[in-house]
């Protein structure tokens, strides 16, 4: 029996020794794997830095593009980087001021309203589209030859110092270098209300599409100038009823706004015979602009008398002859 059990015991001893060796080798074997956070941390830091640098670079490029687009775009949405000069030179335009020069403004005809009051075509008074006041005899006007719109000289001079278009019809006013004034501003014959051609209808329709004209047409032109006229505001030059109409436009009982009439535009148009406008374009402008309240801007004693003498000089000249011919 002893001999029969010996192989079994030997087998058990061998298994025990193998397990013991495996256990001892497992206890003495060093750990070579590092914690996950230690192995991943050195690889994540460069990736985060690169991502931040790329985001910063992309944001900087986008900001530069926006700033460049904003600084090189005019208020009307057109690029104002450069413009071609008369001799092929590139001249940089002023981005702060888009108006006309003083010499160009003074080249437009300037005269007293009393000089042409008896020669104008049509009935009713003419008003300045900027201050919305009717012209008086002693006021100095300035005529825009391309569209025949007239304004107070003091009002339109301020407007053209920052803009280069007509306040009513947005016609371009700056002359091209080297061009003749007569060829640049061809005088258009005054339209007849009873026989209006297609060209005038199209031009008037394009004018009515201007937002500024629609705003002005909301005002009522039936105000009678008399003793009951509200006083004008010193800050805006508008009377109280005009400011009320501007803020709260009138409407019909159905709730629809009043449709602007084409005839309202004639309040801003000084319609003169072609010969009169030609003489105004060649006539020298008055040396000093006369205000409706303070006389000439110089403020010196006797300036008002000189203005009346200048008016008399022009009135007794070619304009009086034209009046006699028309009568």
Swiss-Prot record:
Residues 303-327 have a biased composition (Basic and acidic residues). It comes from Arabidopsis thaliana (Mouse-ear cress). GO terms for molecular function: transferase activity; zinc ion binding. This is RING-H2 finger protein ATL34. It is a single-pass membrane protein. A zinc finger (RING-type) spans 128-170. PROSITE patterns: ZF_RING_2 (PS50089). Keywords: Membrane, Metal-binding, Signal, Transferase, Transmembrane, Transmembrane helix, Ubl conjugation pathway, Zinc, Zinc-finger. The RING-type zinc finger domain mediates binding to an E2 ubiquitin-conjugating enzyme. The chain crosses the membrane at residues 47-67.
């Amino acid at each position: 029996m002893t001999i029969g059990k010996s192989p079994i015991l030997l087998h058990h001893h061998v298994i025990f020794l193998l397990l013991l060796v495996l256990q001892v080798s497992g206890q003495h074997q060093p750990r070579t794997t590092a914690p996950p956070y230690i192995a991943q941390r050195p690889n994540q830091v460069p990736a985060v830095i690169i991502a931040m640098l790329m985001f910063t670079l992309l944001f900087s490029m986008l900001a530069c593009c926006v700033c460049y687009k904003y600084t090189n775009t005019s208020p009307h949405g057109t690029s104002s980087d450069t413009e071609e000069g008369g001799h092929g030179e590139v001249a940089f335009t002023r981005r702060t001021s888009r108006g006309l020069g003083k010499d160009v403004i003074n080249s437009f005809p300037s005269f007293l309203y009393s000089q042409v009051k008896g020669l104008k075509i049509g009935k009713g008074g003419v008003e300045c589209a900027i201050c919305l006041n009717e012209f008086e005899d002693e006021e100095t006007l300035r005529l825009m030859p391309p569209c025949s719109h007239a304004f107070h000289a003091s009002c339109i001079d301020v407007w053209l110092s920052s803009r280069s278009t007509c306040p009513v019809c947005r016609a371009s006013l700056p002359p091209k270098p080297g061009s003749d004034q007569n060829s640049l501003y061809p005088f258009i014959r005054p339209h007849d209300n009873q026989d209006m051609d297609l060209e005038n209808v199209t031009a008037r329709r394009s004018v009515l599409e201007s937002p500024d004209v629609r705003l002005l047409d909301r005002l009522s032109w039936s105000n009678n100038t008399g003793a009951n006229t509200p006083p004008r505001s010193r800050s805006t030059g508008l009377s109280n009823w005009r400011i009320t109409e501007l803020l709260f436009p009138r409407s019909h009982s159905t709730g629809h706004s009043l449709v602007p009439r084409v005839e309202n535009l004639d309040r801003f148009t000084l319609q003169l015979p072609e010969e009169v406008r030609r003489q105004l374009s060649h006539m020298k402008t008055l040396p000093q602009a006369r205000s409706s309240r303070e006389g000439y801007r110089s403020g010196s004693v006797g300036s008002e008398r000189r203005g009346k003498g200048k008016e008399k000089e022009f009135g007794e000249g070619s304009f009086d002859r034209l009046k006699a011919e028309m009568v």
